[in-house]
Regions:
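C-terminal beta-sandwich/jelly-roll accessory domains of carbohydrate-active enzymes
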Residues: 271-276, 295-373
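Alpha-helical scaffolding segments of alpha/beta enzyme cores, especially the outer helices
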Residues: 46-60, 82-86, 132-139, 198-205, ...
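Aromatic- and acid-rich polysaccharide-binding/catalytic face
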Residues: 20-39, 71, 84-130, 154-155, ...
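Aromatic-lined carbohydrate-recognition surfaces of secreted/lumenal glycan-active proteins
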Residues: 11-17, 57-79, 130-163, 214-221
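Aromatic/acidic polysaccharide-binding cleft in carbohydrate-active enzymes
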Residues: 151-279, 287
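Acidic-and-aromatic substrate-binding clefts and catalytic sites of carbohydrate-active enzymes
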Residues: 6-8, 35-37, 45, 72-82, ...
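Conserved, mostly hydrophobic/aromatic
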Residues: 27, 98, 137, 160, ...
Length: 373
């Protein structure tokens, strides 16, 4: 696809009306080849060798491309992390990223025996498993970096992530259809506010590790557990995750500040001493804006105070809240805004301090700005 003409695929591209190559810059050297669900599954040693040789050939065609090696497909696999170590030993000098996939709440990955899906606190803690997954892969990368005495840093391509709403609240999993039907129906129940919160907590975990996560792709975009839902006989509508993703895209660009947080703690069905609050702060040097992402994981209002050291004069801009009346609420073609974003002006700013109230089970963005006199 990188040639203008003269190869089978470049000529095929031209027959479809595209004279110029698509200019794809990032290439994945395989996908989930460690997974037993795949035909052509490989051992780490086999894949590492093949990937390194493929990378060599691809860079001879275009030295400027970036390459993603296949990382372990899930923490549930016996080869988890050992796969990453072995592959990285082989491809460390020839690839730029290692992939990571995570679907929070998918039974095959987050084993039902290790958490209680009916317990909201337990369910929301699945975001901490994503964060641990990220930390594990970073550790594997840095271990190989040390082994090789390398100055190169391996980055992560989180090229599949989402929160999956499968369980008692989403019994209408798949509509019955002909197994050979082209474009069959997929689940269109949408995701609940509870799963929206889980997705939002996962986004904060990603933001905290953007020093190593250079690529992140939400999966899937349309239907299933996607951000956008549609049907041949109904209007399109958005899931709660769309609101989260939109606000992260708008206000999650900048410098992630190191934060220390204190909050009440609680126990869940299987977890002890869980923080009731999660938060991330982003500073935008160009606009002097400080955006605080905060999640109240409890059923009560939360008094939220930020000690913003070094920010002497602050001006409140907006408090954005993704919320719903009930955790089980979900958007649909008939009720498109049961989960929505609400804007209020309830932030109080003082010298190095920001205060507001976080609603129960809510995902928030507090937007403030340095006042320049």
């Amino acid at each position: 696809m990188l040639f203008r003409s003269g190869t089978y695929y470049s000529e095929l591209r031209k027959t479809h009306g595209h004279e110029v190559p698509y200019g794809v810059h990032v290439w994945c050297v395989g996908n989930e080849v460690d997974g037993p669900w795949n035909i052509g599954q490989k051992r780490a040693e086999e894949y590492g060798w093949d990937a390194a040789e493929a990378a060599k050939a691809m860079r001879r065609i275009d030295p400027k491309i970036e390459l993603v090696a296949v990382g372990s497909s899930g923490t549930q696999l016996d080869t988890y992390l050992e796969w990453d170590r072995v592959v990285l030993e082989r491809v460390y000098d020839s690839c730029d990223y290692i992939s990571l996939h995570r679907y929070m709440g998918m039974p095959a990955i987050d084993e039902l025996s290790t958490y209680d899906r009916r317990d909201t606190g337990d369910y929301l803690e699945l975001a901490s498993r994503l964060e641990r997954n990220i930390q594990d892969v970073i550790a594997a990368c840095d271990y190989v970096k040390g082994r090789k005495h390398s100055d190169k840093t391996m980055y992560i391509s989180l090229d599949e992530y989402n929160a999956v709403d499968i369980g008692p609240e989403a019994d209408d999993f798949l509509k019955e259809c002909d197994p050979w039907e082209v474009g069959p129906c997929t689940r269109r129940t949408g995701i609940s506010m509870r799963t929206t919160l889980l997705f939002g907590l996962g986004m904060l975990a990603i933001l905290r590790h953007t020093d190593r996560i250079r690529i992140a792709c939400q999966s899937i975009l349309i239907n299933g557990d996607g951000m956008v839902m549609c049907s041949p006989d109904e209007d399109a509508w958005v899931n709660g995750s769309w609101h989260i993703f939109r606000l992260c895209s708008l206000y999650g660009r900048g410098k992630v500040l190191e934060t220390v947080q204190e909050s009440d703690r609680y126990d869940t069905a299987t977890c002890k001493d869980v923080a009731a609050l999660d938060s991330v702060c982003i500073y935008h040097e160009d606009t002097k804006e400080l955006d605080i992402f905060a999640v109240n994981k409890t059923e009560e209002d939360m008094e939220f105070t930020v000690q913003a050291a070094g920010f002497q004069q602050l001006q409140a801009l907006e408090h954005l809240t993704v919320t719903a009346e009930h955790l089980s609420d979900r958007n649909s073609a008939k009720e498109k805004n049961k989960i929505t974003t609400v804007s209020t002006q309830d932030i109080t700013c003082g010298a190095e301090q920001i205060q507001c109230i976080l609603k129960p089970y809510s995902w928030n963005v507090l937007r403030v700005k340095e006042r320049i006199e």
